[in-house]
Structures are given as C-alpha cells and as structure tokens.
C-alpha cells in the first residue's frame, strides 16, 4: 500500500480482514490450554467487530456500526450461551437465560436504531416482547421435570396460539388494520392469508394434541406398572 499508493488507504481494512480470517481458522485457541470454545467465540466476535469498525471509519458510517455489532452478538449469544451453560449447575435453565438475553439484546438493538433513525420504538419493543414470550415460556416448561411428550405438546400448542394472533397484536399496538383472519376455502385469491394461517393453526394444534395424548398414555401406563 505504501509502495503503490504512498499512503495507508486500504491497508487497515485488509489487515482487519486477515485478523478476522485468522481467528476463524481457529488460531487464537492454540495459545490457551482450556476454555477454547470461549476463546474462539470471543476472538471471532471481536475480530468481526474490528473489521466492521474499520469499514465504518473508512466509509464515515459509524451510525450502523453498533447496530451491526449488537445484531451479531444476538446470534453469538443464542448459539454459544447454551453450550457454555450446559456443564454448569444451572444447565437446566440455559435456554431460559439464552432467550431472555436475546430478548434484552433485541430491545437494546431497537433503542440503538431509534437513536439514529426515529420511529415508534415503544410499540416495537412491545411486539418484540410478545414475539419472545413463546420461546421464553417454552424454555421454562422444558426446564420443569415431567413427561417430555407433554412438555412438547404444551409448548407447541402455546406457541401456535400466540403466533397465530401476532398480526392481530401488531394491529392493536400500532393502531393499524392490516391483518385478516377471515377463512374462505372457496376463494383463495382474496382469503389466502387467512386460509393459510388457519390451516397452520389446525395442523400444529393437531400435532400438539398428538404429543399430549402420547404423554398422557405413557403416564397412565407408568402408573399402572
């Protein structure tokens, strides 16, 4: 870069990109005898942030830098936190912690975006919390100690009902009227959205009933023995 352009123009971008690639091979873990997965996750995340920061400086676009870093952090948190907690005393609650942390980070992401681009952040946070409810409640149910088939059936049924009414909740929170739950299987052109939602609702509830039925049967069989 110095020889050709007589300045350090693209040098730092290439250097940060090489560091990012170096961390993913992975090479930083060779310097540690333990907790290599933690070293890998931290080093790769920081190297990505370094590359993004370098690009942001060169493009004068620091407004999106923190947004990108938080978004990537959400992905890392969802993948690695359950793994890190799997061998601890709180391993039963790993998914509760993971989904709750993801919800908090998503809210922080919305707040950060709101700082640079004004929008209705409070309704956005409310619908985010609503969308995370099935995941968090399902994680709580899975942490309880009872029949696995019953837990699966309850989680599917609860999540199905909550997500079925997502568009309705969005309309109520944002004051719109865009969702339609009208069902008419003889007219798919105008009622395709409602028809598909209804079919998914029935299929998923049927699956949940099947799981619950198997769970009850296994419990009854166990009690008879």
What are these regions (language model features)?
Residues 1-2, 7-8, 19-20, 24, ...:
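N-terminal juxtamembrane cytosolic/stromal segments of multi-pass membrane proteins
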Residues 13-23, 42-52, 72-76, 164:
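Hydrophobic alpha-helical transmembrane segments of multi-pass membrane proteins
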Residues 142-225:
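C-terminal membrane-adjacent module
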Residues 21-33, 78-89, 140:
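C-terminal ends of transmembrane helices
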Residues 40-45, 96-105, 150-162:
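Central hydrophobic cores of alpha-helical transmembrane segments
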Residues 2-15, 33-38, 51-71, 88-95, ...:
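Membrane-helix interface and helix-disruption motif detector
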Residues 77-84, 107-111, 129-151, 169, ...:
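Alpha-helical transmembrane segments in multipass membrane proteins, preferentially the mid-helix core
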């Amino acid at each position: 870069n110095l020889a050709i352009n007589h300045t350090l123009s693209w040098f730092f971008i290439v250097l940060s990109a090489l560091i990012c690639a170096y961390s993913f091979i992975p090479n930083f873990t060779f310097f540690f005898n333990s907790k290599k997965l933690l070293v890998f996750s931290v080093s790769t995340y920081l190297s990505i942030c370094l590359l993004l920061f370098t690009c942001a400086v060169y493009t004068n676009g620091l407004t999106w830098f923190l947004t990108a870093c938080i978004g990537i952090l959400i992905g890392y948190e969802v993948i690695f936190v359950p793994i890190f907690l799997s061998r601890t005393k709180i391993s039963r609650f790993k998914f509760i912690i993971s989904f709750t942390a993801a919800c908090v980070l998503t809210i922080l992401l919305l707040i950060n975006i709101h700082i640079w681009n004004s929008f209705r952040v409070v309704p956005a946070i409310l619908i985010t919390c609503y969308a995370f409810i099935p995941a968090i409640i399902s994680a709580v149910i899975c942490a309880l100690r009872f029949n696995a088939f019953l837990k699966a059936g309850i989680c599917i049924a609860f999540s199905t009902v909550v997500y079925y009414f997502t568009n309705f909740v969005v309309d109520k929170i944002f004051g719109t009227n865009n969702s339609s739950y009208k069902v008419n299987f003889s007219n798919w052109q105008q009622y395709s959205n409602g028809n598909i939602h209804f079919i998914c609702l029935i299929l998923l509830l049927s699956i949940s009933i099947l799981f619950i039925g198997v769970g009850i049967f296994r419990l009854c069989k166990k009690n008879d023995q």
